[in-house]
């Protein structure tokens, strides 16, 4: 399943290539991918057509695109995308038609470009036909922080297709009203004083209603470790189960939970409330580090199901210390001159990977 680094890589790609483009048409190939858009496919098509993609935002594993009305005003709802287990958002730029032969016919390169543009990917579920870049977009953001990415860097004067591809159909697209979600520190004027005034809520503090229950993730500028610590202290659940709870800390899935727990030398079943303040701090630092490192590598691609908007794979799997390494030596133990092989153990209908020496099981009570 795509986790925070993979979704952020897709968000950045959309911000780079698609913002400022108006939606000329919507083609729903498989309505199952719109099951969370309760008014149905016809409403989805009508609501998007004529609006422009304004900003690209993310919280945890959720991505959303704010929209501009024809007059440039911010629309009161956003397009939410959840990639599920196998979802992809792909960008296809329309050939500009400037590369013709002297006789006026198509060149081989242009013909190939047109064929690539017209090709329908396998498992295509929804296609947005986008126009050239206009003047109605506002910059998108990660977790609400400002960004200057615009589609002007990539064939801004030609059309584009934004394709939602999903093999397993666990993901989907839907429209959700925007609601305020002002960080406590901002509301108290401790940071960004005056930014929220006279009832005006900036776009970066608006989230889709369907996403508001999702906790802030470690790459969010307003992520508060103290809030997470308090949630840890209220539960006796194992720490990995808590890390996967998107209402506690978002964006962390099975891969990065195992990687962070390995770095913090914690067993996945250790009750969250038994972590000391220092252990909590070390774990959250490990989570943040592994997410940042994976993001820098373009995410983790074990197969063709995860790619960025241009269809390119990430390569963080080359740097994994725990996940998928059952039977291989623990890197940390090997550096210390010890021999300890990583083990794979069942965990909630999936697997956990750990070092039996570095990450000892908690004592039974």
Where are the language model's segments positioned?
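Structured catalytic/nucleic-acid-binding cores of DNA maintenance enzymes
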Residues: 1-365
């Amino acid at each position: 399943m795509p986790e925070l680094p993979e979704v952020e890589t897709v968000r950045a790609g959309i911000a780079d290539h698609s913002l400022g483009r108006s939606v000329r048409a919507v083609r729903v190939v498989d309505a199952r991918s719109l099951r969370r858009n309760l008014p149905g496919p016809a409403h989805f098509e009508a609501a998007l057509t004529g609006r422009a993609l304004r900003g690209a935002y993310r919280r945890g594993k959720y991505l959303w695109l704010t929209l501009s009305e024809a007059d440039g005003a911010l629309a009161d709802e956003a397009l939410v995308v959840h990639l599920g287990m196998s979802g992809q958002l792909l960008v296809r730029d329309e050939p500009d038609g400037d590369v013709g032969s002297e006789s006026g016919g198509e060149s081989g390169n242009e013909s190939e470009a047109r064929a690539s543009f017209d090709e329908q990917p396998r498992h295509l579920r929804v296609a947005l036909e986008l126009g050239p870049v206009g003047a109605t977009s506002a910059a998108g953001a990660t977790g609400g922080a400002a960004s200057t990415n615009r589609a002007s860097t990539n064939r801004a004067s030609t059309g584009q297709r934004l394709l939602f591809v999903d093999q397993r159909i666990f993901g989907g697209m839907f429209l959700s009203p925007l609601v305020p979600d002002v960080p406590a520190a901002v509301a108290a004027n401790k940071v960004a004083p005056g930014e929220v005034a006279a009832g005006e809520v900036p776009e970066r503090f608006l989230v889709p209603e369907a996403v508001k229950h999702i906790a802030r993730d470690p790459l969010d500028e307003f992520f508060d470790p103290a809030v997470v610590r308090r949630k840890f202290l209220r539960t006796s659940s194992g720490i990995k189960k808590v890390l996967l709870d998107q209402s506690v800390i978002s964006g962390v899935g099975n891969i990065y939970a195992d990687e962070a727990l390995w770095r913090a030398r914690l067993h996945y079943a250790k009750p969250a409330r038994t972590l000391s303040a220092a252990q909590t701090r070390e774990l959250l630092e490990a989570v943040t580090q592994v997410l940042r490192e994976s993001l820098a590598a373009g995410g983790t691609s074990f197969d063709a199901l995860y790619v960025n908007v241009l269809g390119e794979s990430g390569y963080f799997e080359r740097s994994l210390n725990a996940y998928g390494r059952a039977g291989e030596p623990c890197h940390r133990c090997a550096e210390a001159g010890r021999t300890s092989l990583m083990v794979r153990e069942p965990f909630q209908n999936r697997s956990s990977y750990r070092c039996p020496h570095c990450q000892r099981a908690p004592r039974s009570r």
